[in-house]
């Protein structure tokens, strides 16, 4: 059942969409110490992510119309996953802020693209489950980061775990392109 596969992927994508949103609050004290930045630097990071999110949300309709929802979801998950992993590799705070913008670009396209797709193809009831899936993701993000900090002694490993999950999801979307376009 191709539609069932798409529904499951959509739910997993919204879980993955919520995860990064739940990581930063728990990781922030460690990130701040790592980069030796002031407390208010978090505002720059959040603003960058929000800016990317708003831009891609606003442009997602024409982009999906041109490239198709499957390609946009695959590319957006890859962008978000690469950004999350990139957070762990950058040597300076400004680069992490820039990656926050890129991550926001990916997240905004996933959110608006999937919302539109599910509303058009599955209906209102599935929209409720889609948003419940986001709740699972945003709830699991702090658990993942707490585990990374307490058992692995690194905020970076929390972002790597979620980034790898996003990259895996990008491969899932890429491998189901033909199903998304029908």
Please tell me what each predicted stretch does:
Residues 5-37, 57:
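Extracytoplasmic
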Residues 71-86, 94:
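Structural signature of the two symmetry-related core transmembrane helices
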Residues 9-10, 92-100:
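Short hydrophobic/alpha-helical segments at membrane-entry points of transmembrane helices
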Residues 36, 68, 89-94:
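Helix-breaking motifs and short loop linkers at transmembrane-helix boundaries and internal kinks
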Residues 56-69, 149:
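Helix-to-loop junctions at the C-terminal end of transmembrane segments
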């Amino acid at each position: 059942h191709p539609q069932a596969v798409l529904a499951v992927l959509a739910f997993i994508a919204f879980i993955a969409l919520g995860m990064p949103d739940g990581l930063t609050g728990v990781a922030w004290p460690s990130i701040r110490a790592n980069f030796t930045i002031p407390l208010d630097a978090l505002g720059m990071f959040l603003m960058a992510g929000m800016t990317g999110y708003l831009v891609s949300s606003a442009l997602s309709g024409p982009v999906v119309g041109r490239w198709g929802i499957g390609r946009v979801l695959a590319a957006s998950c890859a962008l978000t996953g690469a950004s999350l992993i990139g957070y762990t590799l950058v040597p300076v705070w400004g680069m992490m802020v820039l990656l926050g913008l890129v991550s926001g670009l990916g997240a905004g396209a996933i959110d608006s693209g999937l919302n539109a797709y599910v509303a058009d193809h599955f209906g209102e009831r599935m929209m409720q489950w889609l948003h419940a899936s986001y709740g699972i993701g945003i709830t699991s993000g702090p658990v993942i980061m707490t585990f990374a900090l307490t058992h692995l002694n690194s905020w970076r490993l929390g972002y790597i775990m979620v980034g790898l999950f996003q990259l895996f999801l990008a491969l899932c979307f890429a491998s189901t392109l033909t199903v998304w376009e029908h």
